Amino acid sequence: MNRVRGFEVVVDEKRKTTGEITLPTAGTSRAMAYDFYSTDEWHAAPDAVIKVWTDVKAYMQDDECLILNVRSSMGGKWMLANTQGWIDMDYYSNESNDGNIGIFLKNISGQTQHIEKGERIAQGAFFKFLRADNGNTDVIRTGGFGSTNK
């Protein structure tokens, strides 16, 4: 089978959780985005930021990226701490964390919030992109989360 884009569980030694991992799924046959699930139960005080590791990595083509947003059903209580998550294709299987996707969530509700294990917390959609003629680099990614230019 020719792989184009999709999701896999990260290798065991790079996992951050111990429970069962649910790969992202589309809510319907025509949905644009894929739901990401919480691997653990979480509590967060008002204005607290939590990092939810998914233990999932995404593979895609050279001219694609995966963009993450908080699910609309969580929008009144949570936001992504960096407002949007951008996953480059070279994040997949990087040597630092095997491409483990982490989601920073900030509690914006003004009261303590709870996330259940298995709850859908974010959505990711694959996008094609263009590169500028004079903006390319030969730098190869070696790090994981937040490692570009480090």
Predicted segment positions?
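DUTPase catalytic domain/fold
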Residues: 1-150
